[in-house]
Amino acid sequence: KMLEKIKEIAADSLGADVNEMTPETSFKEDLGADSLDLFEMVMALEEDFEVEIPTEDLENIRTIGDVENYLQNR
């Protein structure tokens, strides 16, 4: 359920196809996201999951699965 929501948010923020995403999908390499795209996605994630994701944590979040692991450990 969480993974599906993350994929939906990423698809909306990055203009990507949710059906082509897996936990291994890289935001930058596979989806062509730039810093602004990632910023928008993180803001949407924070709002949806009611968490704060500090900027320093973002360097460890490169894939859909990274987001899921991060949110599960919050």
Map each language-model feature to its residues:
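Generic leucine side-chain signal with a strong bias for well-ordered alpha-helical environments
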Residues: 3, 14, 31, 36-38, ...
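C-terminal structural segments of small proteins and small subunits
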Residues: 41-74
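Residue-level recognition of oxygen-bearing side chains
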Residues: 26, 36, 63-66
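Thiotemplate assembly-line natural product biosynthesis machinery
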Residues: 1-19, 72-74
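Generic structural marker for isolated residues within well-ordered, non-membrane alpha-helices
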Residues: 7, 24, 42
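Phosphopantetheine carrier-protein modules
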Residues: 13-32, 48-60
